[in-house]
Amino acid sequence: MSTVTTPQPTAAARRKTLYFLTWRWHFYAGLFVVPFMLMLALTGLVMLFDDEIEQARYAEVLNITPQAQVMPVSQQLAAVQKAYPEAQVTQFIPAPQPDLANRFSVLFSDGSTQFVTVNPYSAVVLGTIDRSESWYEWANSIHGTLLIGDWGDYLIEVAASLGIILLVSGIYLWLPIDNARKAGFLKIRVGSGARIFWRDLHANLGGMLSLVLLFFLISGLSWAGIWGGKLVQAWNTFPTYYTWGEKPQSVLTHADLNHGSEKEMPWNLEQTPVPQSHHHGGEHEMVAVNPQFGIDQVIAQANALGFTQYRVAFPRGETGVYTVSANTMAGDIVDPRDDRTAHFDQYSGALLTEVTWQDYSPFAKAMAAGISLHQGDLSVWNKIANVLFCLAFILISVTGVVMWWLRRPTGQARLGVPPRFEQDGIWKTGLVTLLVIGVAFPLAGATIVLALLLDGLLVSRIAKLKVAFS
């Protein structure tokens, strides 16, 4: 009795099957990711030039002539309060250079927030800048939420998470594993036809910038609502219980000190409650009140602690505190090792707590260091590099669309999905990769499961859909 054996696939056949399996997932991920990649790169370009755009738009209320004598900040504050008696001053930001005006963030009764600019040499109010109308605010809101709130944030997180799949699959497709890929590795074949040219440009540019793209994806995901806010940021939030002891805490968090979509507080402090001032009228305790303690004394103490460029948040209510912060998240400084946040009792002037770089977790330190790179704040060369990266990401996205356009089935209602080659065992390799990424990035995992369900329940069972997705 003879035994029938199933021939084992050759190594070349297995590589071919794995190649097309990877290409299919690269294609599907790209369908979702490319529009978001273009949006993120374009809004990122606007945000990179925020300072230049703002100074051009509001030159008359920002540019001043430096003088020898600077007026006390308390006098500048008084001028703002006199000019806008019904408004509440919430923040003071000293100018980063002597030929620019200081800023006071002012909350008006209609809920709008504006910067009131003041000449620090004369304490004269120069004008206002509507914070909600800045190009940065507009671009940052699109960059983070698509202007639709949490659902926009979730969609961007899905795109960034699937971007990891796009990146991993793209690297595999680019590596010179077989002769076909070796022929175009690290070279662009101009005379071999349009499809080869665009493929080489797309693959080599994406492959060479893969680590840069991974950096932008991971650092960007750290701000996202699920992976960032619920997982990574929560794990790295500053441990106030053990460090701040029994000091009273409010329900106000550091994130509440941000303005709009602007991130002004350190990433690892955003979910941490802000300490409270000891109200001098308490029933069980009397705290020494310093009637002379105000913004000038806050700044003097901040300077004594080592603050250079910073911002001051004013107390909110009777138990509020003065918060002085200098961090890379807000762009106050570029060296993450100088990150520092301090809270002062508004009555006694006592330093309630101080958090510095040394207190950060390893991931929080990585975020503080990475944010300057992400925002192009380190130097003019960092900004130029980020501009080139944004343009490269746009080119990678466009070349991907061009590649699809050139190989799409013309005259047919078909998407042009890369072909499938069935082979026992190969699908497990792809599935393991997808599972690892899906577990590491929950929204990517949920999207993959949804895609598989739609494929199994609808696409594979409805003839027209099956043809369209082929």
Language-model segment annotations:
Residues 1-470:
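Conserved histidines in hydrophobic membrane contexts and catalytic metal-binding motifs
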